[in-house]
Swiss-Prot record:
Entries under SUPFAM superfamilies matching the protein: Zn-binding ribosomal proteins (SSF57829)
GO biological processes: translation
UniProt keyword annotation of Aminoacyl-tRNA synthetase present: no
Keyword vocabulary terms for this entry: Ribonucleoprotein, Ribosomal protein
Family: Belongs to the bacterial ribosomal protein bL32 family.
Gene Ontology molecular function: structural constituent of ribosome
A cellular component term, taken from the record's GO annotations: large ribosomal subunit
InterPro entries the UniProt entry points to: Ribosomal_bL32, Ribosomal_bL32_bact, Ribosomal_zn-bd
Protein name, UniProt field: Large ribosomal subunit protein bL32
Amino acid sequence: MAVPKRKKSKSRRNMHRSHCKLKVPNIGIDKTTGEYKLSHHICLGGYYNGKQIVEVDSNI
């Protein structure tokens, strides 16, 4: 069984885990509705980049 020769220091341990972190979502404000939305996603009103892409039923 493989066993490490020397103890990994706290610094090297943390550097090894540097990619294991949470990313902050890229949130912006929609131009048409003024609501928050994820970048490069359609807002709940069906708008993308100021243009209506999808017809949204208002009964929902």
